[in-house]
Amino acid sequence: MSTIKFLRSSTHNALRSSLGWCRLAASRPRYDYDLVVLGGGSAGLACAKEAAGCGARVLCFDYVKPTPVGTKWGIGGTCVNVGCIPKKLMHQASLLGEAVHEAVAYGWNVDDTNIRPDWRKLVRSVQNHIKSVNWVTRVDLRDKKVEYVNSMATFRDSHTIEYVAMPGAEHRQVTSEYVVVAVGGRPRYPDIPGAVELGITSDDIFSYEREPGRTLVVGAGYVGLECACFLKGLGYEPTVMVRSIVLRGFDRQMSELLAAMMTERGIPFLGTTIPKAVERQADGRLLVRYRNTTTQMDGSDVFDTVLWAIGRKGLIEDLNLDAAGVKTHDDKIVVDAAEATSVPHIFAVGDIIYGRPELTPVAILSGRLLARRLFAGSTQLMDYADVATTVFTPLEYSCVGMSEETAIELRGADNIEVFHGYYKPTEFFIPQKSVRHCYLKAVAEVSGDQKILGLHYIGPVAGEVIQGFAAALKTGLTVKTLLNTVGIHPTTAEEFTRLSITKRSGRDPTPASCCS
């Protein structure tokens, strides 16, 4: 069967089965459960709770395999425990350190000559918050009548799940009409000597007991850049090793601006470089050997910590998907538009699925919509287009829609107009902060009402700025509407309503003042 036929037929079957669920529910108990969810992260929990709210009998399995250095965590998945939440808290901690220095310029009597964070206290505070979220999550599952088992679960067949309730206990089995796989992913390690034994990942850094010190961050995706930036803001010495380009998949101009901002702030980059080995020295520090792939020259340097941020892999190896007949691509699960796998009653949501944005809000909404289709008669599918995202660096980068390169590739350079400009945040003037990289642009169609295809912004609180514009873009925002919108002054978000200079014009996009 061709891929297109598979997608069409499985989507149709998934929607047809969801519409018929209410009629079939009266035939219980053919299976032990109506829904078994594998994975207690954002997608799995959202799906499980929504399904239970629709009257389904739901069982959720969640299990965290410790990292090579022994890090483990509770229910909630990557976002709560080792992703979005601790990352944002560390980001905030680093911004507060910067704010202390700015406070002096604003008239506060603060001794900013010896500002230094207490790493252990910060980690303890972050972990205490995470544990409170773990507890609230468990209580929420109980209140919503979702059964929860903290155990690794695998497929016995397409309707049967096998698990061990506790180490040494006998294997148990449960059956379910539907199964949703939402096990997410974990960071990759490079296949080089010392990588696993001596390095850590984002799974470890937020609970790391000792100060990171001089840190080599290997990888220049958003995880690597965010970690490097909050470490720098907390007073440590990160270096970023880049194999090829920073922020692959993002707009190139914006990505390069972000890297330039980081360089200006004292974060060095090792460009076109790959690690070859990590060795522990007699003093306990780590010797990293590497090679520049452009010059073919070998080099080495010594660090206190090596953090791998070279991408993530789906956790499919322990699921026994072959027993269920579920098809995969690399380490991800292939699904159709209704999140159905190659087995019509088995679905997948979240980071485990192939070719979809790996973002928490995407996982949550797709999980809820799937539950509604299965148990509430809904036919609404998840719309994966034009999803906004933010890179939480000191000047944040947020975007929604197409990059400039994608727009040109899909529409042609002659059919694209790019409105752009630098700007000067008012609050930057008194502490004399650099505004060199505060920049935004709108990628639009050149003709007609000039529908906007993508919005990009580097600056303070980028996520807060772009969120509202994301809704506008989804509803067909045009350049005319944008420029006819009265901005809120003085804010950085209003800069989008003042975008009058196009790249094609060749005019200087640098403003003369904060109000020009």
Swiss-Prot record:
Q: For this entry, list what GO says about its biological process.
A: cell redox homeostasis
Q: What class of enzyme is it?
A: oxidoreductase
Kindly list the positions annotated as binding FAD.
62-79
> Disulfide bonds, which pairs?
79-84
The record, for PROSITE patterns, names: PYRIDINE_REDOX_1 (PS00076)
Among SUPFAM superfamilies, the record links this protein to: FAD/NAD(P)-binding domain, FAD/NAD-linked reductases, dimerisation (C-terminal) domain
- State its location(s): Mitochondrion
Q: Give the protein's cofactors.
A: FAD
> Which Gene Ontology terms of cellular component type are present?
cytoplasm; cytosol; mitochondrion
The UniProt record lists the EC number as 1.8.1.9
Q: Which residues form the active site?
A: 489 (proton acceptor)
Q: How does it assemble?
A: Homodimer.
**Main role?**
Thioredoxin system is a major player in glutathione metabolism, due to the demonstrated absence of a glutathione reductase. Functionally interacts with the Sod/Cat reactive oxidation species (ROS) defense system and thereby has a role in preadult development and life span. Lack of a glutathione reductase suggests antioxidant defense in Drosophila, and probably in related insects, differs fundamentally from that in other organisms.
> By what name is this protein known?
Thioredoxin reductase 2, mitochondrial
What species is this protein from?
Answer: Drosophila melanogaster
